[in-house]
A protein has these predicted regions:
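Short alpha-helix immediately C-terminal to the canonical SAM-binding loop
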Residues: 44-47
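Class I S-adenosyl-L-methionine
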Residues: 7, 64-74, 82-257
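Conserved beta-strand elements of the Class I
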Residues: 13-15
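Conserved SAM-binding motif I beta-strand of class I
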Residues: 35-40
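Class I SAM-dependent methyltransferase "Motif I" SAM/SAH-binding loop
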Residues: 17-21
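A short, Lys/Arg-enriched amphipathic alpha-helix followed by its capping loop at the start of a domain
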Residues: 27-34, 52, 273
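Conserved SAM-binding strand-loop segment of SAM-dependent methyltransferases
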Residues: 54-62
Length: 281
């Protein structure tokens, strides 16, 4: 353990870049880490972070916060994916948002955490004919980090959705635990599938009022699933997360809530990684 970051009686500390609503941070805290600080530019997400992680310091911009950040044992970050996603224009690391990776590495190079964990969409692997991923790996190496990468799917960690993300786990001059990213996720906890054999029908015009169908929705928003024997009544929409705390930042803005959750790192996946790393302290 790095003495400048933690003591023998303290929990290993984590600093979170591009923290979102704290998916990475939650998973690491569930494994026994303590979040020291979080950097997130979206004020809505920062409100959630402030509510859910009151013990952590919050900062807004990875480009300007370096002088305020304290040393930590682990830095985690799901850096922006918009410029490498197949749904975007794919400017890669030259893009304004995904290019913030270099600002993140400037922080890492200065703080020198023992471990670094990064996350992005699988599109990072083939962006710019694979050159962008080579640049990412080279940047880590130039800062003294060596490790592994692997694409992990959240559905194998008890989450009812297919969510493939590439994770890079690297140590400062040391490899992560042997076989770390060669292991499989807990495949015995494969999440149950949603019903796919129920009939579909056109939604009532009232349900479509003010609704815009996104370009990437697989099933038309004008269709709804009919549940055989179900009651023809409106029901309260369920959330994937609790409203308490979210409402303080989201103010009942459903779109903001969905976007924040959609951008978040899946906590069970983060926890699986964290449980491997905490054995090294």
């Amino acid at each position: 353990m790095d003495a400048q970051n933690t003591t023998s009686s303290a929990k290993p500390t984590v600093g979170s870049l591009f923290a979102g609503i704290g998916g990475f941070d939650l998973g690491f805290e569930q494994a026994g880490f303590q979040t020291a600080w979080q950097v997130e530019i979206d004020p809505v997400c920062r409100a959630v972070l402030s509510d859910r992680f009151p013990h952590a310091a919050q900062y807004a911009d990875v480009r300007t916060c370096l002088s305020e950040l304290k040393s930590v044992d682990v830095v985690v970050g799901g850096f922006p994916c918009q410029d490498v996603s197949i749904a975007g224009r794919r400017r890669g690391l030259a893009g304004e948002r995904t290019g913030l990776f270099f600002d993140a590495m400037r922080i890492v190079d200065n703080l020198k955490p023992r471990w670094l964990v990064l996350e992005n969409v699988p599109g990072l692997l083939n962006s710019n004919d694979g050159k962008d991923f080579q640049t990412v790996v080279q940047s880590l190496a130039e800062c003294g980090y060596v490790g592994y990468w692997r694409v992990l799917d959240a559905r194998y960690f008890g989450v009812p959705t297919k969510r493939r993300r590439v994770f890079l786990v690297a140590g400062l001059g040391e490899q992560p635990p042997f076989g770390f990213m060669a292991d499989t996720g807990p495949v015995g906890r494969l999440a149950g599938k949603a019903e796919t054999d129920s009939p579909w029908a056109d939604a009532h015009p009232t349900l479509l009022a003010g609704f815009t169908i996104g370009s990437n929705i697989d099933i038309s928003g004008a269709n709804i699933c009919l549940i055989p024997g179900g009651r023809g009544a409106m029901v309260e929409r369920g959330r994937a997360v609790a409203d308490d705390g979210l409402l303080k930042g989201l103010d009942a803005a459903n779109f903001a809530a969905a976007r924040a959750a959609g951008n978040a790192v899946c906590p069970p996946v983060a926890r699986w990684i964290a449980e491997k790393l905490i054995t090294t302290f």
